[in-house]
A protein has these predicted regions:
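Conserved catalytic/ATP-binding subdomain
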Residues: 63-67, 125
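Catalytic helix-loop patch of NAD(P)-dependent Rossmann-fold dehydrogenases
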Residues: 2-48, 55, 60, 64
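Short, structured secondary-structure boundary patches
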Residues: 18, 68-71, 166, 197-198
Length: 198
């Protein structure tokens, strides 16, 4: 999602202007362009999946820089209070890792996907609602609203909801794991294995 920057319309389709607000978005666009150019010019098969917030087992949870959802789960499991910037009202499209892996497998094996770009998503939810679902699954947990620091406010993209109709139509992919089921599977995994990820 970081390739798009602030959404000019929702849901965001693959034709949405690419206006990243941070260097990660710029890097994602550059990587995508290189791969698709190699596909077109040199015949090296490539497809680009524009992923959104992904969570699940085996994802790092030490910090919030990559994978804020797993970091939230870690903080709640450690009985720490989460500070949600802006009250966590911003909507993110969320995918459980198994659904992302499924999309990668399908796209990688499909001739129709060659040279294409697809959005992943399908589970839009506010960050506060995600945290509430985790606290419900754990049976405990707290969060509080915090202000955006200036450096974070400058790169905050606001709401993001992906239009996944292209990948649904062309590759018959859509998420199968609900956010609630994914949270339960993630918590179950980290109850046994969290020490390896800290």
């Amino acid at each position: 999602r970081n390739q798009y920057g602030k959404a000019q319309y929702l849901p965001v389709d693959e034709n949405h202007p690419l206006e990243p607000t941070d260097i990660n978005g710029v890097n994602a666009i550059a990587g995508e362009k290189y791969h698709l150019m190699y596909d077109k010019v040199y015949g090296i098969k490539a497809v680009s999946l524009r992923m959104t917030n992904t969570f699940g087992p085996r994802h790092q949870m030490k910090h919030s820089r990559q994978g804020v959802l797993n970091w939230f789960i870690r903080l709640l499991m450690d009985k720490k209070t989460i500070g949600l910037m802006g009250g966590g009202k911003q909507i993110r499209d969320i995918n459980y890792i198994d659904d992302v892996v499924s999309a990668l497998e399908i796209a990688g094996a499909s001739k129709e996907a060659d040279g294409e770009v697809y959005n992943l998503g399908g589970n839009p939810l506010s960050l506060a609602d995600f945290v509430e679902k985790v606290t419900k699954a754990l049976g405990f947990g707290k969060w509080e609203s915090t202000q955006f620091p200036d450096d974070r406010k400058a790169i905050e993209v606001g709401d993001y909801i992906a239009d996944i109709s292209k990948i649904k139509k062309q590759l018959s992919w859509e998420p199968k794991i609900s956010v609630d089921e994914g949270i339960n599977k993630t918590i179950e995994y980290y109850i046994k294995n969290q020490k390896h990820y800290l």
